[in-house]
Amino acid sequence: ENFSGGCIPGYMRTADGRCKPTY
């Protein structure tokens, strides 16, 4: 489980620490 930002694949870590889709 080496996801960047600790999010699932296809998601990115936002400035407020949440994970949101990149699409």
Curated annotation (Swiss-Prot):
S-S bridge residues: 7-19
One GO term describing the cellular component: extracellular space
Tissue: Hemolymph.
Gene Ontology molecular function, alphabetical: cytokine activity
UniProtKB keywords: Cytokine, Disulfide bond
Record bears the keyword Acetylation: no
Pfam entry (one): GBP_PSP
Family, similarity comment: Belongs to the GBP/PSP1/paralytic peptide family.
Physiological role: Causes rapid, rigid paralysis when injected into Lepidopteran larvae. The physiological role may be to reduce hemolymph loss following injury and promote wound healing.
The protein, known as: Paralytic peptide 1
Higher taxonomy: Eukaryota, Metazoa, Ecdysozoa, Arthropoda, Hexapoda
